[in-house]
Amino acid sequence: MKLSLSPPPYADAPVVVLISGLGGSGSYWLPQLAVLEQEYQVVCYDQRGTGNNPDTLAEDYSIAQMAAELHQVLVAAGIEHYAVVGHALGALVGMQLALDYPASVTVLVSVNGWLRINAHTRRCFQVRERLLYSGGAQAWVEAQPLFLYPADWMAARAPRLEAEDALALAHFQGKNNLLRRLNALKRADFSHHADRIRCPVQIICASDDLLVPSACSSELHAALPDSQKMVMRYGGHACNVTDPETFNALLLNGLASLLHHREAAL
């Protein structure tokens, strides 16, 4: 699996691994790269079965497999310790990494994540699956922004959304891979294991997220023994894209604080 690694800004700079959501594309984090790369060595990647890491995924593909294959390729690249920033599905992969490789994960940042899928989120995905079956990739892609962005943000950026739709359709991961990744997301349940995650965790959520209710992050915060929660009042599910200034400030401050907190505890 191919990774994209930025040059370390200084010797022994901490490593931050960015894990996107169901779309799987490393480019999702473009609004964060410039600021993160000033302080950290940043790892981005297209998840297996998407983008420049094409593959046919098994029917029983799981979050645990996503975590294992990422950890293995990081170790192969000489990276043994790393912070994880995960969005939605990426936050699930981050929690799995923290459980399975506790000596490697220094800090976890969960963006609009959850312990187990909420009934509302499941309903949203059921609607999207019906669109996929009835209208194919184009229907899935055209509906996706409705679940990601606030309405006023979309209305002011119609040409941009049209360009994003065309790009997403051209690089669509394929129906089978998408459904197998979605099923892995729906099966994931950390409600009985979250208290075993010992690394410090920053939880960021948006109160206007249409896809994942912010209450999911409150449940996550209550379940994680060493966590702090920040709420963005605006931004939707893709709040790091729609309001990068607010998000980046929260992320940079959180990473610096939690990494310092971890070092002080060692």
From Swiss-Prot:
Going by the record, the broad EC class of this enzyme is hydrolase
Gene encoding the protein: rutD
- Please name the NCBIfam families in this protein's record: RutD (TIGR03611)
Annotated Gene3D superfamilies: alpha/beta hydrolase
Question: Does the keyword field hold Transport?
Answer: no
Q: Does the keyword Hydrolase apply?
A: yes
Family of this protein = Belongs to the AB hydrolase superfamily. Hydrolase RutD family.
Record-given protein name = Putative carbamate hydrolase RutD
Instruction: Return the GO cellular component terms, semicolon-separated.
Output: membrane
